[in-house]
């Protein structure tokens, strides 16, 4: 079947439009007073609300997929389920939406790291969507969204200058645990699996290259998280206006 007429396109379009509609709904919700005074913070707040929703849905969905189809933990290339396939399409739609939102809102320069991440994620997910291979790998990758629930909550509190809240202080320790369990551990497991494709000229080799770049980004983000929350005196000083965009 020609790629142009692949039945996954309506799923991707539907997922993308769903997140677009969700953003419109979330924009109508009351905002913290501190956020309302700054257009950039307002945009970022709405962006994070959508991200927070995606993380909750896809994180729980990924756990359910692995519970329903545990062979995805071992047969990463060949294991497949309708639920896992729809999850990958759902998350790809989010990344498409967020990429468009960043570009249209002229936040490309401030959010270029997110764009790089989204492009790599979409490149990896499309292998599962259009060729129905490595769907299990896509589901395992989306375990990271469980960690993102707490990371996004952290960023939302920082935007609102709420670092002194007890919730923020408790959340930073939860973040460490979740980062290890749902970000570092799955990433290490996937990297070990995909190393078998090193030196080949296959789809697995392409995904290995993406995975290694994501590994580097994850390590960099982890070091920033540690500096910002546990060694603030060592964290690089930035203008307060755009600090929340990258930390």
Swiss-Prot record:
| Subcellular location field | Cell membrane
Record-linked Pfam families: TRAM_LAG1_CLN8
Question: Which topology term describes how it sits in the membrane?
Answer: Multi-pass membrane protein
Q: Which residues lie on this side of the membrane: Cytoplasmic?
A: 68-83, 195-201
Reply yes or no: does the keyword Cell membrane apply: yes
Q: Which UniProt keywords apply?
A: Cell membrane, Membrane, Signal, Transmembrane, Transmembrane helix
Q: Which SMART domains match?
A: TLC
| Any one of the GO BP annotations | plasma membrane organization
Which residue intervals are annotated as intramembrane in the UniProt record?
A: 124-144
Quote the gene name from the UniProt entry. Tlcd1
Q: What does the entry list under GO cellular component?
A: plasma membrane
Q: What does this protein do?
A: Regulates the composition and fluidity of the plasma membrane. Inhibits the incorporation of membrane-fluidizing phospholipids containing omega-3 long-chain polyunsaturated fatty acids (LCPUFA) and thereby promotes membrane rigidity. Does not appear to have any effect on LCPUFA synthesis.
The answer to keyword Transmembrane applying to this record is yes
Which first-to-last residue range defines the signal peptide? 1-27
Q: What is its main location?
A: membrane
Where in the numbering of this chain does the TLC domain appear? 40-234
Q: Provide the membrane-side ranges marked Extracellular in the record.
A: 28-46, 105-123, 145-173, 223-247
Q: Where are the membrane-spanning stretches?
A: 47-67, 84-104, 174-194, 202-222
User: Which protein are we looking at?
Assistant: TLC domain-containing protein 1
């Amino acid at each position: 079947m020609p790629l142009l007429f692949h039945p996954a396109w309506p799923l991707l379009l539907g997922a993308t439009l769903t997140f677009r509609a969700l953003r419109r709904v979330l924009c109508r919700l009351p905002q913290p007073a501190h956020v309302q005074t700054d257009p950039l913070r307002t945009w970022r707040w709405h962006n994070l609300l959508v991200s927070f929703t995606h993380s909750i849905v896809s994180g729980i969905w990924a756990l359910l997929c692995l519970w329903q189809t545990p062979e995805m933990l071992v047969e990463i290339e060949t294991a497949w389920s309708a639920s896992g396939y729809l999850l990958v399409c759902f998350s790809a739609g989010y990344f498409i939406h967020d990429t468009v939102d960043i570009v249209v809102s002229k936040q490309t320069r401030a959010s270029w790291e997110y764009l790089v991440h989204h492009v790599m994620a979409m490149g990896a997910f499309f292998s599962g969507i259009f060729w129905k291979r490595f769907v299990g790998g896509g589901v395992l990758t989306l375990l990271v969204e469980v960690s993102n629930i707490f990371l996004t909550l952290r960023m939302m509190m920082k935007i609102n200058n709420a670092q002194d809240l007890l919730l923020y202080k408790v959340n930073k320790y939860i973040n460490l645990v979740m980062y290890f369990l749902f970000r570092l551990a799955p990433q290490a497991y996937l990297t070990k699996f995909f190393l078998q494709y090193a030196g080949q000229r296959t789809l697995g080799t392409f995904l290995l290259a993406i995975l290694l770049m994501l590994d580097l980004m994850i390590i960099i983000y982890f070091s920033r998280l540690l500096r910002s929350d546990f060694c603030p005196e060592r964290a690089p000083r930035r203008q307060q206006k755009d600090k929340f965009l990258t930390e």
